[in-house]
């Protein structure tokens, strides 16, 4: 259930439990929206698009090798080719985080669950997912004999980070902390993966918390980067609203009299009061400049 800023503000004097009873929602929802409005203000999220945030964790390959330096390992030396061991996902703006692993569900059921989510999604948001997560997930579909899910638009925030900024680090943890979105969960390092591969329940609990935190960070960074995105579809098409903001899909564009110019034409410039994204009209102002010169 979506809660407006006015609803949350009306319960500011109440505890989370009391506010949950008043608004007939779970306490988790109250806490989530209080954090959301404290951080983002009255930012509205697209309601008609199915936007999936996802992150996977993989186990390493195991095999026979003769040393630690400059080894060429053939396919005949591979014992186990590794692959996806778990994933965490959530729908943008939802309270629920979906987690599945080999340990809790078995490999095939885990793969089936992630296939169903991707098949339902209009957009899939990842951090470095075009190079890693999506391809690794496709590996599992191929191994299990699944056909591809229905097409979706991939939004890789790593690419936005790389194209738009020149930060000292391209890691999710860095841009998440920089934007006030939080930090990755600290853990014991590679020993965590070893514990999971050995079936240690405590290791799997930590892995789940780590995986779920990455999904939350990815969602928060997505919201922070909304006005910077260059590879996002026009969000207005999901609601059928041609005047909606292309970035967030909310009908909140403002024309303050400014224009933007291409090489030979001029267009009205708009800014969204919800996400602050800039866009331009699709109808030129005045006549196209007829020039006898080129460059």
Predicted features, each with a name:
Residues 125, 174-239:
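Acidic, Mg2+-coordinating catalytic module of metal-dependent nucleases/exonucleases
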Residues 18-23:
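Short alpha-helical "recognition helix" segments of helix-turn-helix
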Residues 1-15:
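Short, amphipathic alpha-helical "recognition" segments used to contact nucleic acids or chromatin
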Residues 44-118:
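Conserved RNase H-like, two-metal-ion catalytic cores of nucleic-acid enzymes
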Residues 93-178:
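Conserved DEDDh/DEDDy metal-dependent 3′-5′ exonuclease domain
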Residues 269-295:
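Short metal-binding segments enriched for Cys and/or His
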Residues 246-250, 274:
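Short, cysteine/histidine-rich loop/knuckle motifs that typically chelate Zn2+
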Residues 30-46:
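Short, solvent-exposed alpha-helical "recognition" segments
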């Amino acid at each position: 259930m979506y809660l407006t800023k006015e609803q949350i503000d009306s319960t500011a004097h109440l505890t989370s439990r009391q506010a949950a009873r008043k608004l007939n929602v779970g306490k988790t929802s109250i806490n989530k929206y209080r954090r959301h409005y404290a951080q983002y203000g009255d930012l509205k999220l697209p309601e008609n698009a199915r936007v999936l945030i996802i992150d996977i964790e993989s186990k390493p390959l195991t095999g026979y090798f003769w040393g630690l330096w400059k080894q060429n390992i053939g396919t005949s030396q591979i014992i186990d080719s590794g692959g996806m061991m778990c994933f965490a996902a959530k729908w943008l703006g939802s309270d629920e985080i979906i987690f599945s692993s080999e340990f809790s569900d078995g490999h095939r059921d885990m793969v089936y669950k992630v296939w169903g989510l991707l098949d339902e999604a209009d957009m899939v948001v990842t951090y470095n997912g075009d190079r890693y997560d999506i391809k690794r997930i496709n590996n599992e579909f191929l191994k299990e004999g699944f056909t591809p899910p229905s097409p979706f638009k991939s939004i890789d925030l790593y690419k936005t980070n790389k194209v738009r900024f020149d930060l000292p680090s391209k890691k999710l943890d860095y841009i998440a902390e920089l934007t006030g979105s939080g930090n990755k969960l600290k853990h014991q390092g590679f020993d965590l993966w070893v514990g999971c591969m050995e079936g240690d329940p405590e290791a799997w609990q930590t892995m789940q918390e780590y995986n779920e935190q990455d999904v939350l960070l990815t969602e928060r960074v997505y919201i922070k980067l909304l006005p910077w995105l260059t590879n996002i579809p026009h969000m207005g098409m999901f609601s059928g609203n041609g005047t909606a903001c292309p970035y967030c899909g909310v009908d909140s564009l403002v024309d303050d009299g400014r224009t933007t110019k291409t090489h030979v034409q001029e267009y009205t410039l708009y800014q969204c009061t919800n996400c602050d994204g800039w866009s331009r009209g699709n109808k030129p102002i005045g006549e196209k400049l007829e020039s006898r010169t080129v460059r």
